[in-house]
Amino acid sequence: MGDNKNNGDSGKLLYCSFCGKSQHEVRKLIAGPSVYVCDECVDLCNDIIREEIKEISPKRDEDKLPTPHELRKHLDDYVIGQDQAKKVLAVAVYNHYKRLRNGAIKDGVELGKSNILLLGPTGSGKTLLAETLARSLNVPFAMADATTLTEAGYVGEDVENIIQKLLQKCDYDVEKAERGIVYIDEIDKISRKSDNPSITRDVSGEGVQQALLKLIEGTVASVPPQGGRKHPQQEFLQVDTSKILFICGGAFAGLEKVIEQRAHTGTGIGFGAEVKGEADKATISQILSQVEPGDLVKFGLIPEFIGRLPVVATLTELDEAALVQILSEPKNALTKQYSALFEMEDVELEFRDDALQAIAQKAMSRKTGARGLRSIVESILLDTMYDIPSTQGVIKAVVDESVVKGESAPILIYENTETQAASGEQ
């Protein structure tokens, strides 16, 4: 085989044996025994093969449905703690995909959707749990922010845009999208502004809940192809949302007060009051674990919306020890990610134990949970990552407690075993 663009030997004009284009109309013409193929036909063949592989792969994936134990084990590899939430999620997700495989109706019994509501403070791992589950099942995953959603016809994001995001993740393959997972964050922010139904239109609160009802329960959503705007003459992609798993999450700040009020009704004041000391006070996570549908209604979610989210899991606040584990133990731990970046420069990165403790303490003081860890580590290593590509002979960088506290720069170790501070001390 060989490349032919100009046939200088014979002066004969060559043509692609497949599309008939001449050598002057294409970039490359590949020659075989009395046969020629152009680069455009090669690209077309590659596209056809890729499409066929894409059609076969979902069928292969459906053959293997991980058990709840296997799903939990996969979550353990990437998410620290939250044992109860992992168990609840593993069972709900397993049941959902079992329902898809075997049909929604079994022996005349209609199987309901097991959509999930996650309650937990900021940075406790709600998004990561949903993302990790989608990755372990090899299904499309899309995330939406409930605060940007409004009812159709108002300024803001239409709820059907959520399905559009899911389609984008799988190249507008409807069949694949219908097996996907959608995570809607900040769901507590669309709560009704008061307990009583309002006479005015609440387009970003109760209105969004009403708009999400059908989508979460199951409807055929009409989505413009390739993300275009809707217009009457357009053909829409029809997506059956009854097969999509919806996971909604939120911090639900203040919900614990609603639960406490219900739990202690009639015993809060007077001579008959139950006196509790500081040691008897339950944590917010312990209180949230006692949540009932009535509490969520009082918080501002409408009963119909709560009914569409039958599985409720509560995540606990992360303490300092958990944050230290998150920094170093998961498969994609932050310290491992930054070590991999430094390895690309042939530099070893070491975080000492006191540095990990100091980073965790800083995140605790900021009250951002695990979400704030990356920004702390990034700021610590910024100058070092800026200098190292231009600095010769560095083989190791060491981060200790003093670096995290801003008292010194990371220690750089050079090939000649001379140790210097990253501040450029020569």
Curated annotation (Swiss-Prot):
An example Gene Ontology biological process: cell division
Binding positions for Zn(2+) per the UniProt entry: C16, C19, C38, C41
Keywords, alphabetical: ATP-binding, Chaperone, Metal-binding, Nucleotide-binding, Zinc
Residues annotated for ATP binding in this entry: P121, T122, G123, S124, G125, K126, T127, L128
Source organism superkingdom: Bacteria
GO molecular function list: ATP binding; ATP hydrolysis activity; ATP-dependent protein folding chaperone; protein dimerization activity; unfolded protein binding; zinc ion binding
Gene Ontology CC annotations of this record: HslUV protease complex
Function description: ATP-dependent specificity component of the Clp protease. It directs the protease to specific substrates. Can perform chaperone functions in the absence of ClpP.
NCBIfam families for this protein: clpX, PRK05342.1
Protein name: ATP-dependent Clp protease ATP-binding subunit ClpX
Native source organism of the sequence: Shewanella frigidimarina (strain NCIMB 400)
Lineage: Bacteria, Pseudomonadati, Pseudomonadota, Gammaproteobacteria, Alteromonadales
Name of the coding gene: clpX
